[in-house]
């Protein structure tokens, strides 16, 4: 079960996401679905079908869990390999 | 805790993530097959890292050699030969063989057991009849 408490340890692929804030202005406000993940980036399929690769470390994301809850996460908490995120310790920046 | 063993809650998340990834792979296959191959790879990485077994329903759904996602009828053929189920991957041509000797043995054992239990019930009935009818049954 993906809950707001464990979402940064859980699977991000398949969740719908919106980029709330970003250092890079052009990607701010983009919304779509996560289709791939690497250590430093998320690949987002936008609503018009285009795909865009977004660095995790420079943005704040709004994820929507399958239950419909909205969760705000600083991308810096997500910077790790997808399989390493389960055991990553979370520190408030 | 054993060395390298992860706490229970981590393993639970790992299992959930593996299941999510394989389901996504299954859903995405018709539109973007490269994505489902990627999801299989990610799921396998998680399974190896946390030493979680990939569930039985998904174990035959990816190639053991090239790790691509397999969808029978689309990029893999399933045939039965010599007491094995053969999965042929159309991506690399590798054939995975899964013997079903255990199921065969179970069926054989069930057959024998059903015979013996039938005889047992027969005997019980005769015993009951014997108790009722006296010596006429036991003479036979």
Swiss-Prot record, chain A:
The protein's Enzyme Commission number: 3.1.26.5
Pfam families: RNase_P-MRP_p29
Cysteine disulfide partners in this protein: none
The family this protein is said to belong to: Belongs to the eukaryotic/archaeal RNase P protein component 1 family.
Signal peptide region: none
Originating species: Methanothermobacter thermautotrophicus (strain ATCC 29096 / DSM 1053 / JCM 10044 / NBRC 100330 / Delta H) (Methanobacterium thermoautotrophicum)
InterPro entries: RNase_P/MRP_Rpp29_sf (IPR036980), RNP1 (IPR023538), Rof/RNase_P-like (IPR023534), Rpp29/RNP1 (IPR002730)
Subunit structure: Consists of a catalytic RNA component and at least 4-5 protein subunits.
Domain of life: Archaea
Swiss-Prot/TrEMBL induction comment: Constitutively expressed (at protein level).
GO cellular component: cytoplasm; ribonuclease P complex
Substrates-to-products reaction catalysed: Endonucleolytic cleavage of RNA, removing 5'-extranucleotides from tRNA precursor
Gene3D superfamilies (alphabetical): Ribonuclease P/MRP, subunit p29
Cellular localization per UniProt: Cytoplasm
Protein name per UniProt: Ribonuclease P protein component 1
GO biological process: tRNA 5'-leader removal
UniProt keyword list: Cytoplasm, Endonuclease, Hydrolase, Nuclease, tRNA processing
Keyword set includes Zinc: no
Function in brief: Part of ribonuclease P, a protein complex that generates mature tRNA molecules by cleaving their 5'-ends.
Molecular function per GO: ribonuclease P activity; RNA binding
Curated annotation (Swiss-Prot), chain B:
Gene Ontology MF term list: ribonuclease P activity; zinc ion binding
Entries under Pfam families matching the protein: Rpr2
Induction: Constitutively expressed (at protein level).
Cofactor-binding details, from the entry: Binds 1 zinc ion per subunit.
Cross-referenced InterPro entries: RNP4 (IPR016432), Rpr2/Snm1/Rpp21 (IPR007175)
Keywords annotated in UniProt: Cytoplasm, Endonuclease, Hydrolase, Metal-binding, Nuclease, tRNA processing, Zinc
Enzyme class: hydrolase
Region of interest called Disordered, as start-end residue ranges on this chain: 107-140
Cofactor: Zn(2+)
Reaction(s) catalysed by this chain's protein: Endonucleolytic cleavage of RNA, removing 5'-extranucleotides from tRNA precursor
HAMAP family: RNase_P_4
Quaternary context: Consists of a catalytic RNA component and at least 4-5 protein subunits.
Similarity section: Belongs to the eukaryotic/archaeal RNase P protein component 4 family.
Record function comment: Part of ribonuclease P, a protein complex that generates mature tRNA molecules by cleaving their 5'-ends.
Name of the protein described by the UniProt record: Ribonuclease P protein component 4
Organism: Methanothermobacter thermautotrophicus (strain ATCC 29096 / DSM 1053 / JCM 10044 / NBRC 100330 / Delta H)
